[in-house]
Amino acid sequence: MSFRSIVRDVRDSFGSLSRRSFEVTLAGLSGLTGHHRGKSQSTVHELCDADLIIQESRWASLPPELLRDVIRRLEASESTWPSRKDVVSCAAVCKAWREMCKEIVLSPEFCGKLTFPLSLKQPGPRDGMIQCFIKRDKSKSTYHLYLCLSTAVLADSGKFLLSAKRHRKTTCTEYVISMDADNISRSSSTYIGKLRSNFLGTKFIIYDTQPSYNGAVIPPVGRSSRRFNSKKVSPKMPSGSYNIAQVTYELNVLGTRGPRRMHCVMHSIPASSVEPGGIVPGQPEQIVPRAFEESFRSTTSFSKSSIMDRSMDFSSSRDFSSARFSDIAGGTINGDEEGQNKERPLVLRNKAPRWHEQLQCWCLNFRGRVTIASVKNFQLIAAPAQPPAGAPTPSQPAPPEQDKIILQFGKVAKDMFTMDYRYPLSAFQAFAICLSSFDTKLACE
């Protein structure tokens, strides 16, 4: 039997298993009356569990060598979507298959592929970029992120990844980010984060539903966590709102010609991640918290700037008053000696464009991925680390790692934009940064 036949048999067994379980449940529930209700219900569960055990043991009993060969061949052959869904199906067979898939299917950082939902919060590939595009619907104030499946972006249906919905408020604008294309709300189980702006649209904070662990030891669920089991939740600690990045656009009060200038402080990514041998520590094991209490666990971070009011009152304006643009440009927000001795967060800045005399416009080399000039277009690179006070300024040019484009975003058609990202950003982080470019910015152009 070929490995394709095995995969087909596995997928077919899912459907028959679901139908049999449903039929057994209906048959048992139809006879539930009086004092026999509890006994009949337990019998139904026993039948379903037995059926599940039989089906799972059938596939779990495969020799590990054969299973490894099947998964490895499938991983190599089904490298693109939509055929890559077969790899996801194999991971859902049973625990043994799932563990084997975790062993063979690498993260996007090393394989350059988006396979599981968890891949959306893992760093992109070190070599090359993952090409995506964003569709905007102005009438619904929604934005949908798709994975490119072909080089023809305008004719590409794409593989859906994430969605966002804009909510305008009196003093700010919020973009709710979800894994569901239609149900885009904070109350949904597919909600994974949000983007929030200040009144002028010059500063944005990216919030994640999970804290950035950063290799820190997570304290056990104690008294401070158990108190959230009650109906009264502290208003100063919203569920699943962890500040992981801040995007700042420089004010253009003089109205001079030129593109926007922006900086991104990635609190969950150390500056050393873009250096040779650098890594992004504390990558999540699941895309949403396992339990409600985990959304409230506090963690140690790189520096004082990476905490940034984890438990804050969203009705106040403290979100954006703790940092000046000049501080962000230098790569740190708190300039004290203690903060400089610790690991600094990664700072991204937009690559400076060049003025084209014939076209009379500012130009960036998007290598054909952007075709329409727009003030929203940008390319982000790593900002060089600022030397400590009193240290001599290095005269040698920046290392090649500093010149690599980490994220690029640009317009290709009406309400259609391309988004290409690479390590150390994840798809979620890149999407949130690009959403900030859509927002109206007073005194920035």
Curated annotation (Swiss-Prot):
The F-box domain extends over 56-102
The record's account of tissue expression is: Ubiquitous.
PANTHER family named among the record's database cross-references: TUBBY-LIKE F-BOX PROTEIN 8, TUBBY-RELATED
Protein name according to UniProt: Tubby-like F-box protein 8
> Can you tell me which family this protein belongs to?
Belongs to the TUB family.
Organism of this sequence? Oryza sativa subsp. japonica (Rice)
**Gene3D superfamilies the UniProt entry points to:** 1.20.1280.50, Tubby Protein, Chain A (3.20.90.10)
